[in-house]
Amino acid sequence: MNRVAVVVLGDIGRSPRMQYHSMSLSKLENTKVTLIGYRESEPHPQIVNNDSITIEPLKPFPISMSNSFKKIPLISIFMWPLLAICKVLFQIIQLMYVLLVKVPSPLNTILVQSPPAIPTIFVMQIVCWIRGVHLVIDWHNLGYTLLKLSLSKSDNHPIIRLAKFIERYFAKNAYAHLFVTNEMKIQLVRDWNLKGKTFVFHDKASPIFKSLTDREQEEFLKTFINKYSIKGEDKVYIESVISKKSIRNPKQQTSIIISSTSWTQDEDFSILLDAIVKYDIEHAINNNNNKVEEAQDESVVLAENLLFIITGKGPQKEYYQEKINSLSLKKSRIITVWLDSEDYPKLLACCDLGVSLHNSSSGIDLPMKVVDMFGCCLPVLAIDFKCIGELVKVNYNGFLFKDSDQLHQLLNQLFTHPTNNNTITNTNNNKNLILEKMRKNLTKDRETDTWESNWLTIKPLFIPSSSSSSSSSSSSSSSSSSSSSSNSKSKKD
């Protein structure tokens, strides 16, 4: 019997990469998986209904760190550090109990997501020492950089320096390390002197993320309206999209743009909101002018109606929801919704474009949401930062922007069309040419560059070996994996 514990100190349902790892591990011969994390939202049915996967839910800390004493700042100054210590101790005790008592023997490997790094990596090292098992760290980002962002502190602040030391010291002796970007691997191996095997393992979409036929899209959008109680103008916009699936070039087109956000500081939603307002103001005015021009000139510019669907949960959602509600939009609508896990891939497949506002705290991670969008062959507009070029290739599968002005320009480029006698003219600015070309590129990549094909490179890490030759073979796989990632990147470039 081979048993792997997959640990994420976060919501399992909102941790797609760790769910995909669990699914892949469950397919290994004679292997059982114990998935440990918070069960705040329901994991995918392929996790819940899998006989080879057992979920061990963690209990959240009973006091909210973000809301406690918010209205009493003076008390917050003294109580927040005490609460933070209590929360870490609560997590340590719970993780130790689950991994030392509830997870049965034999346990061969622990695969842990980082961040959060504290207390996760520290606890995992202790458990691995006690139980004599391998630790594999799946690096999504750097924990201390997220802490620095949330506390608005500098690198030299004592808390940030301590967090960085703990993360580096307890991580460096892990059996193996997985990195979401090549830049992350280079930086951590060089600066933190990591000892274990290293693999660049770019995020890949699960098979549940795929394209849908026009008919399947129509059926899902009708279900979406009823299931999520979409009413009023929002419903009218979606019904217009449904009509577009069967009627080519209607006089007034509507497109769906989706953005999945955590509503946190490293995803500045105001950039998208400002771009929407600029697009709306510009084309609401132009729409009135066009009515006059149509009587004098048969050639005018048609701006599509845009329906923005924003998914996700997070601390700033209420703040931006109030801003959205105060807007009086003419050419656009904004819906905020929290989707069931099985509905999210289907909605992505129904959209015309995705937007990513993820701006990395470390500069060396990549947004999983873009990977999922690409899985559904959905082109993406992404905010520009250091490593995003490892994922988004300009003019191939998306575009990059730095601010709301550039995002507004891209929306104009993709969703405004010259018309002649109220019929859209095929020009290079036509969305039907630009986005369709990108969809074809993504479809081609999707056929070969899959989660399953990439996961084969790290598979040896989770198969028990009793000889040094097996270990040597795994090291060889590590080298070939890294070169494979580089070759794959070169081909895409």
From Swiss-Prot:
InterPro entries: ALG1-like, Glyco_trans_1. GO terms for molecular function: chitobiosyldiphosphodolichol beta-mannosyltransferase activity; mannosyltransferase activity. Residues 465-493 have a biased composition (Low complexity). It is found in: Endoplasmic reticulum membrane. GO terms for biological process: dolichol-linked oligosaccharide biosynthetic process; protein glycosylation. It comes from the Eukaryota. Residues 110-130 dip into the membrane without crossing it. The chain crosses the membrane at residues 72-92. Residues 93-109, 131-493 are cytoplasmic. Keywords: Endoplasmic reticulum, Glycosyltransferase, Membrane, Signal-anchor, Transferase, Transmembrane, Transmembrane helix. Pfam families: Glycos_transf_1. One of its GO terms (cellular component) is cytoplasmic side of endoplasmic reticulum membrane. Its EC number is 2.4.1.142. It catalyses: an N,N'-diacetylchitobiosyl-diphospho-di-trans,poly-cis-dolichol + GDP-alpha-D-mannose = a beta-D-Man-(1->4)-beta-D-GlcNAc-(1->4)-alpha-D-GlcNAc-diphospho-di-trans,poly-cis-dolichol + GDP + H(+). Residues 1-71 are lumenal. Its main location: endoplasmic reticulum. Pathway: Protein modification; protein glycosylation. It is a single-pass membrane protein. Belongs to the glycosyltransferase group 1 family. Glycosyltransferase 33 subfamily. PANTHER family: BETA1,4 MANNOSYLTRANSFERASE (PTHR13036), CHITOBIOSYLDIPHOSPHODOLICHOL BETA-MANNOSYLTRANSFERASE (PTHR13036:SF0). Participates in the formation of the lipid-linked precursor oligosaccharide for N-glycosylation. Involved in assembling the dolichol-pyrophosphate-GlcNAc(2)-Man(5) intermediate on the cytoplasmic surface of the ER. This is Chitobiosyldiphosphodolichol beta-mannosyltransferase. It comes from Dictyostelium discoideum (Social amoeba). The gene is alg1.
